[in-house]
Amino acid sequence: MYKQPRQELEAYYFEPNSVEKLRYLPVNNSRKRFCTLEPFPDSPPYNALSTATYDDTCGSCVTDELNDFKHKIREIETVMMGPDSLDLLVDCTDSFDSTASQEINGWRSTLEAISRRDLRADLVSCAKAMSENDLMMAHSMMEKLRQMVSVSGEPIQRLGAYLLEGLVAQLASSGSSIYKALNRCPEPASTELLSYMHILYEVCPYFKFGYMSANGAIAEAMKEENRVHIIDFQIGQGSQWVTLIQAFAARPGGPPRIRITGIDDMTSAYARGGGLSIVGNRLAKLAKQFNVPFEFNSVSVSVSEVKPKNLGVRPGEALAVNFAFVLHHMPDESVSTENHRDRLLRMVKSLSPKVVTLVEQESNTNTAAFFPRFMETMNYYAAMFESIDVTLPRDHKQRINVEQHCLARDVVNIIACEGADRVERHELLGKWRSRFGMAGFTPYPLSPLVNSTIKSLLRNYSDKYRLEERDGALYLGWMHRDLVASCAWK
């Protein structure tokens, strides 16, 4: 979850009161093979993971469903009552007609619920066997799991397909090579990738929550400033700053002069379809539309390589630094003696920023051993896949591509890779607090307006999302699971 979706700025010129709406880019069909994770074609049937024979059938006609149901009933009865009961069961099931459909659906739901519980339990058993070096059991469980997972099934089946991919790679000690292959093999076209990210941006409020909460803290800190410099350590498509520029434009007394320094590497350049100049030109066009004095500076280097001289800090400018979904990519002391994670925070503190915003996934996978890391990943992404399932129909022809290109790589990397090759290294907010405190930061209080604004945003989504403020931070969760945390520092 690290690629930032792009907002089409032109959409805001004609709909100033609907700043959260995005316009989808057209999607070009692509049938290129995506290494171990194969993209979903625009026409059925769905394609599953190429490294295993997954059952990716998402539905059939009523007759086939009835026959499948009869077959499952026969199997259950045969096991429970013995072969003598089979003939009786055949006679009974053959008499089913349309009036029994409600009863059939009830049984089917029960069987599916049992299957889901079994799948989760089997995934855990497989990971546990691997952690105990029980290779025979692990291989046996993988064969069983291949018949249970599906990239077009229920949330746990879809997530299970990617978890299994990671388990297979971890067992084969090929996690690094698989993840590198995922990054080397042909991506979908830029417009397709942008479309997938747009869909994820729209169906889940995670990005919007992060951007709105960070922007609220920056707007509050800069409300009396006339010259504002914002350093964004992963600017991506620059979409976060659309609403902030508009908010500054409406500020009583006129907008400040805004300078944005955008940092990014070639990973996001592909998704943009070009370099950071695309972002700068787009934001400059928007700022001009709203009569906001604007300047953009680009820094095309990896975040871990950024030096103070790259940032162009000027006297007389109020400085804001934004860390949205980026710090978890920085290796810490458990990976490298350079400890870029803490070094970067100390460097930013030396710049004397007025406010620093942090948005991160609320997950604990950084230094965890393999088995607890697997459990944390399964529980975290199960909540995320369930939230997608509520908004994006399972028969949506781009849903599989959204999950594969925007989420699956992260899952595979966390499960399969070790050392420096594991770049997805999330920490809980408590650990981030410790790091910021050691770097010399103190908490910046949240604005009540931010809380109420995000609550209004969540009304457009499922009531299973929950917003909680505690200990000076905002948490966005799905049911009982925290997924994203946001806070500010000074």
Swiss-Prot record:
Main location: cytoplasm
An example Gene Ontology molecular-function term: DNA-binding transcription factor activity
Deletion consequences: Plants display reduced response to far-red (FR) light. Seedlings develop long hypocotyls, unfolded cotyledons, no significant anthocyanin accumulation, and greening after FR light.
Stretches the record annotates as SAW: 416-490
Keywords, comma-separated and alphabetical: Cytoplasm, Transcription, Transcription regulation
InterPro entries on file: TF_GRAS (IPR005202)
Gene Ontology annotations of biological process type: callus formation; photomorphogenesis; red, far-red light phototransduction
Location of the region described as Leucine repeat I (LRI) in the Swiss-Prot/TrEMBL record: 117-178
Annotated localization: Cytoplasm
Motif mapping: VHIID: 228-232
Pfam families, sorted: GRAS
GRAS domain span: 110-490
GO terms for cellular component: cytoplasm
Region Leucine repeat II (LRII), residue ranges: 278-310
Region of interest called VHIID, as start-end residue ranges on this chain: 197-262
Region (PFYRE): 319-413
Family (UniProt): Belongs to the GRAS family.
Purpose: Probable transcription factor involved in phytochrome A (phyA) signal transduction.
Name of the protein in question: Scarecrow-like transcription factor PAT1
Species per Swiss-Prot/TrEMBL record: Arabidopsis thaliana
